[in-house]
Amino acid sequence: MAVHRGSALVAPASDKVQKNKSAQTSGLKQGSRMEKILGFEWTDLSSWQSVVTLLNKPTDPANLAVFRFLFAFLMLLDIPQERGLSSLDRKYLDGLDVCRFPLLDALRPLPLDWMYLVYTIMFLGALGMMLGLCYRLSCVLFLLPYWYVFLLDKTSWNNHSYLYGLLAFQLTFMDANHYWSVDGLLNARKKNAHVPLWNYTVLRGQIFIVYFIAGVKKLDADWVGGYSMEHLSRHWLFSPFKLVLSEELTSLLVVHWCGLLLDLSAGFLLFFDASRPVGLFFVSYFHCMNSQLFSIGMFPYVMLASSPLFCSAEWPRKLVARCPKRLQELLPTKAAPRPSASCVYKRSRGKAGPKPGLRHQLGAIFTLLYLLEQLFLPYSHFLTQGYNNWTNGLYGYSWDMMVHSRSHQHVKITYRDGLTGELGYLNPGVFTQSRRWKDHADMLKQYATCLSLLLPKYNVTEPQIYFDIWVSINDRFQQRLFDPRVDIVQAVWSPFQRTPWVQPLLMDLSPWRTKLQDIKSSLDNHTEVVFIADFPGLHLENFVSEDLGNTSIQLLQGEVTVELVAEQKNQTLQEGEKMQLPAGEYHKVYTVSSSPSCYMYVYVNTTEVALEQDLAYLQELKEKVENGSETGPLPPELQPLLEGEVKGGPEPTPLVQTFLRRQRKLQEIERRRNSPFHERFLRFVLRKLYVFRRSFLMTRISLRNLLLGRPSLEQLAQEVTYANLRPFEPVDESSASNTDSSNHPSEPDSEHVHSEF
């Protein structure tokens, strides 16, 4: 983006009228100052030819090569993890009845063995990029499989996966193999040769856009108000801030406001020489924190690797020059770069420089069009209206990172037989491998279409599919996202038109959030509350679990009629009124007001409270026996409290078994929490080693199948069992797999007000 100091100035033409000496001196000083700050002068922008010359200015390739190496290396680590190579057989196993969510319905996964081949090609492409071996071909070998896998599954889309594809696309057109590459060893013309400035401009511009647009998106009122990541401040990383700030102020000032300021300013801080050290410090601290806060794979490390792109292009040579001479022999050359045909060299005194050729013109056009496109796409939602729900645009390319947090309270899928009219219900997520379809109209349409093709196998003819999905976004009321009266199989959906069956977000109720927080804080630890908002003419059918012995509904706004189904009674509630709900029965809540109704369920899980009291009594009894204050003998059924479960001994009661399980779990948590750093680091390494081991073994099996044919099912089962082994981990370690392969944190546990609440 910026041209660093040392740029050649354009010499004035000899036929121009000489100006007075003071004017020339003043102009020279101004030009030099502008070049020092921005890296270019106004004369570099005076004509298209000047712009082309500027963007193709010869630049040191060292910085670009370091980024190429680091980015490709991180992609090698990413492929088995977030790209899913280690669990590929679970996702694309042949013969599964699975509903998938590609960008285009024509996109289909290949048979499993061929999918492993696709990933192998992608891995080899990343390896070639890293080494600079057959560089251009390696970029293509990585890029095409990457975008195929990316477009194959919208449920895995996120901003950083999209960014990886963009960076790989950019590198494909760049001369990043002109330094520290195998190609340079094999081809003298590419070894230590200049690269055009636009190679850096595109990459710097991309990273600048990621930061700045992310900051602009955080100007959203929810982010500024501190609602987007409200609970993040509970993480131990924010403990130093909580020494001087409350948790609420830490969330508002540190998480939200500082995050906003950093995103808005990071690109500018990195751009200018004077502020770059400050920018490098803060963005490095920011990404190191993110690596611990979120399961986002290689993203923090890719951003850390991109930060030096803003530094002087020759910084790797300066670093090599400071190394011991013996070490310098193993490192890339520190010699000055050589001329390259990819660059345009300014004319020297008395000589006319070469004019920019077609390749130089194309490089400049690519740079300008690409950056303009990247500035436009995050705001192109008016074109892709079908993807707009409560948030705008296709998820993943708008850079609205962490701005919206959702909680799903209730999901119900109803099917109706088109011939008999028979109604039935499906488990949410049946025939899928993801939960993300619940938030997006395009995926819901794909899911309904898929279900309509699968249900006839289960004697459901011409199925109609209805979804009742309740979502809260950024701590608002739980409300319906889609119209539950619409058959989504027959519903109209277009990527370029607004989806009519998406319910609007009730923004008018946003000010209620402060009051809702006050209500929550006023309740005791055993009392739970769920806040509901519903549209006129709709109703909620709900079931109160028998465990909830004390459940009431209270109206906050509007007017509702509550029907107790078993008792065949109706009661209308006005604002502020409430009524008790019987446990173990269904009820319906009808919104009869002309405006949306708001109400809340307040309930106590009496079964859970009783269990907690019993467990607390057992814990107290155990402590009394251990410290000698309880001298009487324990009943036989309580002996396991002291001795644990003994084979052949008395059978513990269910309560004692629950107590012992909890004790073991708490002890394991405490052991892991207090384990020394080297043990935790070893566990981390062993988990990653398992991921890479399984990726390699399963890939070897599939490539063998393609080359030699599949062996017997018995042999395949033995080979897969061997691939699933964890030979490096201690026996007592848990068998949790691929902690980094998921980009989405688990949702909160469902409540008990409904079978799915």
Curated annotation (Swiss-Prot):
Keywords: Acetylation, Disulfide bond, Endoplasmic reticulum, Lyase, Membrane, Transmembrane, Transmembrane helix
Subcellular location: Endoplasmic reticulum membrane
Enzyme Commission (EC) number: 4.1.1.90
Biased composition range(s): Polar residues: 734-745
Amino acid composition bias (Basic and acidic residues), ranges on this chain: 746-757
GO cellular component annotations of the record: endoplasmic reticulum lumen; endoplasmic reticulum membrane
Claim: Transmembrane is one of the keywords in the record: yes
Xref: InterPro entries: HTTM-like, HTTM_dom, RmlC_Cupin_sf, VKG_COase, VKGC_lumenal_dom
Domain of life assignment: Eukaryota
Residue ranges annotated as Lumenal topological domain: 82-113, 158-292, 383-757
Region spans: Disordered: 729-757
Top-level EC class as recorded in UniProt: lyase
GO terms classed as biological process: negative regulation of bone development; negative regulation of neurotransmitter secretion; negative regulation of testosterone biosynthetic process; protein maturation; vitamin K metabolic process
Topology with respect to the bilayer: Multi-pass membrane protein
UniProt GO MF annotations: gamma-glutamyl carboxylase activity
Disulfide bond positions: 99-450
Function: Mediates the vitamin K-dependent carboxylation of glutamate residues to calcium-binding gamma-carboxyglutamate (Gla) residues with the concomitant conversion of the reduced hydroquinone form of vitamin K to vitamin K epoxide. Catalyzes gamma-carboxylation of various proteins, such as blood coagulation factors (F2, F7, F9 and F10), osteocalcin (bglap and bglap2) or matrix Gla protein (MGP).
PANTHER family: VITAMIN K-DEPENDENT GAMMA-CARBOXYLASE
Entry's family note: Belongs to the vitamin K-dependent gamma-carboxylase family.
Quaternary state and interactors: Monomer. May interact with CALU.
Record's miscellaneous remark: The vitamin K-dependent protein substrates of carboxylase have usually a propeptide that binds to a high-affinity site on the carboxylase. CO(2), O(2) and reduced vitamin K are cosubstrates.
Protein name in UniProt: Vitamin K-dependent gamma-carboxylase
Organism of provenance: Mus musculus
